[in-house]
Amino acid sequence: APVVAPAPAPAPAPAPAPAPAPTPAPAPVTVAAPKAVEYPLGVTEIVKNDAGTAEFDLFIVHTNDVHARIVPADGGMGYSKLSTMLKMGRALTDNILVLDAGDVTHGTNLANMFEGETVGVLLDMLGYDAVAPGNHDFNYGADRLIEAARFAEEYTDLKVLSANVLDENGYLLFQPYQVYDFNGFKIAVVGLTTPDTATKTHPKNVQGITFANEEIFEIGQMAIDMAKQYVDYVIVLGHIGMDPDGASGLTTDKIVSKIKGIDLFIDGHSHTTLKEGMKIGDTLVVQTGDYMKNLGLVQLHVKNGKVTATYPMLIPAADVLNAKDSALAKQYGITDVPNDPQVDEYVGYMSAQLSQKLNTLVATLPENLDGERANVRTKQTNLSKLITMAMTAESGADFTITNGGGIRASLKAGNVTMGDVINVLPFTNIITVVEVKGSDVYAALEHGYSKLPDQNGAFSQTDLQVVYNRFAAPGKRILRVLLNGKAIDRNATYKVATNDFMAAGGDGYTMFGKVLSEGSLLSDVFIEFLKKNYPVK
């Protein structure tokens, strides 16, 4: 039977009610914002799209080895056109990730004169999500790069990522990875920097820094394994490259073969053009070449948290610069890719600042220095002698061999500006030290002197004493080569300063051996040499 509670005693009559008080306003309701997802090492997830769509296309735009080609140059499209293309893409979808695989901040006067600031601002303006530092991004010194990374972290959405750049105590100098969320589909981007950086920038730029040369596979696998616990897709943004002749011997294919779990490797450093990417095991490797001659695009089709299809491609700069005649552009109904006026305005402003810098006085010369084309391509001149002296002194090499074709103007007696020197040495060449056997020194000079009496851009400018017979048959012209008054030993090995173009076999100098180190810009070194020896009066 149901249990019935006893009836309560009758309540006392209520007291007369007081006058009603005014009804207070309801307290405001505080709604807590969703807590940002945090991952190991203090990494906070970035939500790029939270629409919750289960099936969608994701577009990964990538560049590498732009080397500060800010405006169209050397076959590249420049940042103004790229900005317009990105705006076109973002007008259609929020599912876009923009990444750069390094060597981006150094390489032209518009970047170099401002220690990379011009490029950093442009990367932010264009909405880049992440960049992995390359060896030449250290050319302004590690402190400058670290400062730029911290500035980007505080004031922009750009991340500078590298999981293998360590200080002298073994601590990471950069954020190692970043997680991005597209409709619940999570991507980890892990940065890597080539251990070749130890020798492919001036040693002073990376003093006290290591690149986990021996531990990179272990560190990389740990990073990927950790990422796989939290994300659906792993991208390595690596300035590593395909060149097996690098000082470290570390190449992308070695990393991909030994580190498991990488879905996409966006590569740089070797300036390799992979038109449709390259599969190594289960990993897709992509690289665009250099100077923004191509824009990389990887389209992922995502369904219920899984990638069901991947479409890599390159968009050639020629199709962007001349869209009206491009079959590729016509497929998408594009007839013109105009410049972005905001980018043009900024580049114009910085170009004006550059002009002011180039007017800075650096030296006062007592005499004219001869850089006339017909002379520097057939004989030593007083200008070429000073340039080779500066290269040897800066690099610590035994001597210098550089190409006469790299000297493009003379310097007049009197005041010399920074712009005057850059007119002499306009190619942003980097001083490079190579290992060369004595017999190959003779071979290099024979090559350089082979076209005499005709002019030759490959003519060897050197601070060695060269005794030669210009009328002998090519290949038999060099009689004797002296270093500090002593004959070069054909069986000995020497450290030779040259430029990065020649070290890579440019102008036919294929006899140069292993690269020992890369240093500063040749123009910067010569400016400092003139300042020291011919101060402004």
Where are these regions (language model features)?
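Acidic, metal/ion-coordinating pockets
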Residues: 34-324, 378, 382-390, 400, ...
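Ser/Thr/Gly/Pro-rich low-complexity, disordered linker/stalk segments of secreted
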Residues: 2-41
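Gram-positive cell-envelope targeting signals
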Residues: 1-2, 108
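Catalytic centers of hydrolytic enzymes
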Residues: 39-57, 68-70, 83, 87-91, ...
